[in-house]
């Protein structure tokens, strides 16, 4: 028997990384919000690797933080190791990665949800999204409780019809053998949504007391203090190392001998797996010529013996898992605490979503996270904050909020999903962004904090910090134009030590700083006019000066891009009536319903010639309207 259990503005179904950000965003924007989860103990669960960040992913975390989200702050508090990756490359691809104490991360995020004003958290299984006349009205739960809402965000992760697979054993389940969500999957289908099936997996967790670390290469954290959040204090934290080892020919031999027992090759697994995070058996088959593969052994936290074996994801039977793990140098006597497994799950085909992450067919129904076909905590959290923001704005009857490809990696992620779709678990990479130099992890606050403040998500404390920082950067950039470095013996001695050409006349500091080998602090001692500035200000000044020419070029590219994005296409256009479009273009445009010429140009099968036809048609329509007005 069903009963009415409460009224809310926004309801979030699921409390993983997408659900947490969605719930916090909606509540912080003033909406009465409810987060429903299968298990209160699994809020912000990290069922796979105990880490946050890495290439492109760190950019997402920084952008979430800049908008007023929580992931960066919580990671900084739960981190047990921090490393800046890609420092040998340009700043566009610098990437911060944190090893996190996964239990501490969960506890901190759970507390954030429980103490957030306007937010309730309840342990209930949602089985039905309630819809009336094409508009969402609430949700119904397994025990009969119904909650009304003007917007619902579905963030169910890998729980939709989840199936755990270990060897020839398979059973319904979510991550870490939790309950799956079965009926909700069928309910979404009944609402007219097209679902697909994906697969992912995770390696075994092993007992650190049974590992010989002397046979592995230590991977320590950086001595320099790093943070994901722009407002986290710059303080030293306790750090623990990770370890590097490799598979061997014996490892590969055991895997090859047991491929017939692999669900991946026996037909038990039907879902498509992630291209950029393949299982170890898939790697051995696809890269048969490689004699070894990297394996990273990572701590799951400070208060557990469990170690995560990155690079050894598998669904092979437990006896095979133990045999192959024991062929890894340093793991000859290893004990497995939790076996590796694969998980299959349903996902929503993301081309059914708008850029706001609202479904095209049902008003007020949003989806975010792995349910949209992505992989990764960071991708999920990024979608979560955007869906939460837009759900709140819809309730408040305000204009929707979205980010373009030229504004944020979040914009790249969402645009890829809703325009191109995905036929495998989607992972964001820096290579997917056209304007990488503009979308650096260091300047996410400059790009997004004002936007977050305008919609009511960024706090005054965060906003004041942002304003002070960027005012300092702007002032220092102007000030440096007035500082001149003398052409004397002391200066040239420093330049020579840096293998930089000497100067024969007094030179503006800003000109010297443009040289790749010159750092701000290197020359600071050559003048009496330097200030004691925060490191984040100095780093930003350096980047802006050194890459000024490249930045200007990308800004010009963005201007051209935005012209195409500004040419709006109504979703009710009858493409059959537009002469000159190819058959494939008509089919794709009808299916995906792009909202701009820019979006249309990124759909596979829509050629430059088709775009020209659309531009001509738009101009003809504009003239018709103008003529009618006259």
UniProtKB/Swiss-Prot annotation:
Location within or outside the cell: Cytoplasm
A GO molecular function held by the record: flavin adenine dinucleotide binding
UniProt entry keywords in alphabetical sequence: Cytoplasm, FAD, Flavoprotein, NAD, tRNA processing
Binding-site positions, FAD: 14-19, 126, 181, 370
Pfam name, any one: GIDA_C_1st
GO biological process: tRNA methylation; tRNA wobble uridine modification
Annotated NAD(+) binding sites: 273-287
Cited SUPFAM superfamilies: FAD/NAD(P)-binding domain (SSF51905)
Coiled coil: none
Cofactor(s) required, per the database record: FAD
GO cellular component terms, A-Z: cytosol
Claim: ATP-binding is one of the keywords in the record: no
Assembly notes: Homodimer. Heterotetramer of two MnmE and two MnmG subunits.
Entry function: NAD-binding protein involved in the addition of a carboxymethylaminomethyl (cmnm) group at the wobble position (U34) of certain tRNAs, forming tRNA-cmnm(5)s(2)U34.
Membership in a protein family: Belongs to the MnmG family.
Entry protein name: tRNA uridine 5-carboxymethylaminomethyl modification enzyme MnmG
Organism of origin: Desulforamulus reducens (strain ATCC BAA-1160 / DSM 100696 / MI-1) (Desulfotomaculum reducens)
Top-level taxonomy: Bacteria, Bacillati, Bacillota, Clostridia, Eubacteriales
């Amino acid at each position: 028997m069903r009963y009415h259990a409460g009224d809310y503005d926004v309801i979030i179904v699921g409390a993983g990384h997408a659900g947490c950000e969605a719930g916090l965003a909606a509540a912080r924007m003033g909406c009465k919000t409810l987060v429903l989860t299968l298990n209160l103990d699994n809020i912000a669960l990290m069922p796979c690797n105990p880490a946050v960040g890495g290439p492109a992913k760190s950019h997402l975390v920084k952008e979430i933080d800049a908008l007023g989200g929580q992931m960066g702050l919580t990671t900084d508090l739960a981190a047990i190791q921090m490393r800046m990756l890609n420092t040998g490359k340009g700043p566009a691809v610098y990437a911060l990665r944190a090893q996190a104490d996964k239990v501490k991360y969960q506890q901190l995020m759970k507390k954030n949800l429980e103490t957030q004003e306007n937010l309730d958290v309840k342990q209930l299984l949602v089985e039905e999204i309630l819809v009336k006349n094409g508009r969402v009205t609430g949700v119904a739960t397994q025990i009969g409780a119904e909650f009304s809402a003007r917007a619902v965000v579905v963030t169910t992760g890998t729980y939709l019809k989840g199936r755990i697979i270990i060897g020839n054993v398979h059973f319904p389940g979510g991550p870490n053998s939790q309950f799956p969500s079965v009926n909700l999957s069928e309910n979404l289908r009944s609402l007219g949504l097209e679902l697909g099936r994906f697969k992912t997996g995770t390696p075994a967790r092993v007992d650190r007391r049974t590992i010989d670390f002397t046979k592995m290469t230590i991977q320590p954290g950086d001595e320099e203090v790093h943070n994901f959040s722009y407002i986290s204090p710059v303080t030293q934290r306790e750090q623990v190392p990770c370890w590097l080892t490799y598979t061997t020919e014996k490892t590969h031999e055991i895997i090859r001998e047991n491929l017939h027992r692999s669900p991946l090759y026996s037909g038990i697994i039907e879902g498509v797996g992630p291209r950029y995070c393949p299982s170890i058996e898939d790697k051995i088959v696809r890269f048969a010529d490689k004699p070894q593969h990297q394996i990273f052994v990572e701590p799951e936290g400070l208060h557990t013996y469990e170690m995560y074996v990155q690079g050894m994801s598998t669904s092979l039977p437990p006896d095979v898992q133990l045999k192959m793990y024991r062929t890894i140098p340093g793991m000859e006597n290893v004990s497995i605490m939790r076996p590796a497994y694969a998980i299959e799950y349903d996902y929503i085909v993301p081309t059914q979503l708008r850029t706001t992450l609202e479904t095209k067919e049902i008003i007020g129904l949003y989806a975010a996270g792995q349910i949209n076909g992505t992989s990764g905590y960071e991708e999920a959290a990024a979608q979560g904050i955007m869906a939460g923001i837009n759900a709140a704005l819809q309730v408040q009857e305000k204009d929707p909020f979205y980010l373009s490809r030229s504004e944020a990696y979040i914009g790249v992620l969402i645009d890829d999903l809703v325009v191109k779709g995905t036929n495998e678990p989607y992972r964001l990479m820096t290579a997917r962004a056209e304007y990488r130099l503009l979308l650096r992890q260091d300047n996410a606050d400059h790009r997004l904090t004002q936007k977050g403040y305008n919609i009511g998500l960024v706090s005054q404390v965060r906003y004041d910090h942002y304003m002070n920082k960027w005012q300092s950067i702007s002032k220092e950039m102007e000030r440096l134009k007035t500082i001149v470095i003398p052409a004397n013996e002391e200066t040239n001695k420093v330049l020579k030590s840096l293998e930089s050409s000497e100067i024969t006349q007094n030179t503006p500091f800003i000109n010297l700083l443009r040289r790749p080998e010159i750092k701000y602090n290197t020359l600071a001692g050559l003048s009496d006019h330097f200030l004691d500035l925060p490191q984040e200000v100095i780093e930003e000044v350096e980047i802006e000066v050194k890459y000024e020419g490249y930045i200007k070029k990308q800004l010009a590219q963005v201007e051209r891009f935005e012209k195409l994005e500004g040419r709006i296409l109504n979703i009710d256009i009858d493409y059959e009536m537009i002469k000159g479009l190819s058959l494939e273009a008509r089919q794709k445009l009808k299916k995906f319903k792009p909202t701009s010429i820019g979006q249309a140009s990124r759909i596979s099968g829509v050629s430059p010639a088709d775009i020209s036809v659309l531009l001509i048609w738009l101009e003809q329509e504009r003239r018709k309207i103008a003529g009618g007005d006259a």
